């Protein structure tokens, strides 16, 4: 596996963590507004994953199909906190915002240290990643 593929697959896995977390949260929250938002965010993650996977496949490599252990642990942690919290929606929003932080930092790090052949793709996807991050961050702060 090339360095480029490895880097892109890592971003795919981290982004998939977010996608799966949003999909899970849709089932857990009762607020229809949050469910719609989480669905939109999950779709945004799917779009980013597809763009990254397309680049990996174009290099005749196999795109990552899973997530990370850290992503799964964060989801379990959020479930536990939501069970104990009085406002499950705010708990999921806070944990999803942290997932967005992780995704954003991974993309920024990849842009800074990544392979030159991925720069254009990462620059194209970064505004989408940042927009999701900013939206969840604003929502988290509005719920405090």
Where are these regions (language model features)?
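Terminal, compositionally biased segments
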Residues: 1-3, 20, 36, 58, ...
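Alpha-helical scaffold segments that form or flank carboxylate-/histidine-based iron centers
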Residues: 4-11, 32-51, 89-93, 118-129
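Acidic/histidine-rich alpha-helical segments that form the ligand environment
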Residues: 7-27, 72-123
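N-terminal first-folded block
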Residues: 29-31, 56
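Conserved alpha-helical segments that form or flank metal/cofactor-binding pockets of metalloenzymes
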Residues: 36-70, 135-139, 143
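Charge-rich, acidic-biased intrinsically disordered regions
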Residues: 43, 61-79, 121-128
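Amphipathic alpha-helical hairpins/coiled-coils and adjacent low-complexity
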Residues: 50, 57-60, 64, 101, ...
């Amino acid at each position: 596996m090339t360095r480029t593929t490895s880097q892109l697959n890592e971003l795919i896995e981290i982004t998939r963590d977010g996608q799966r977390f949003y999909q899970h949260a849709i089932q857990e929250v009762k607020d229809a507004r949050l469910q719609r938002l989480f669905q939109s965010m999950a779709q945004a993650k799917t779009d980013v994953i597809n763009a990254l996977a397309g680049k990996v496949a174009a290099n005749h490599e196999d795109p990552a199909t899973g997530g990370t252990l850290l992503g799964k642990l964060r989801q379990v942690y959020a479930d536990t906190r939501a069970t104990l919290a009085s406002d499950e929606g705010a708990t999921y929003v806070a944990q999803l915002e942290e997932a967005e932080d992780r995704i954003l930092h991974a993309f920024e790090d990849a842009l800074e240290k990544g392979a030159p052949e991925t720069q254009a793709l990462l620059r194209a996807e970064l505004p989408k990643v940042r927009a999701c991050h900013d939206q969840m961050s604003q929502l988290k702060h509005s719920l405090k």
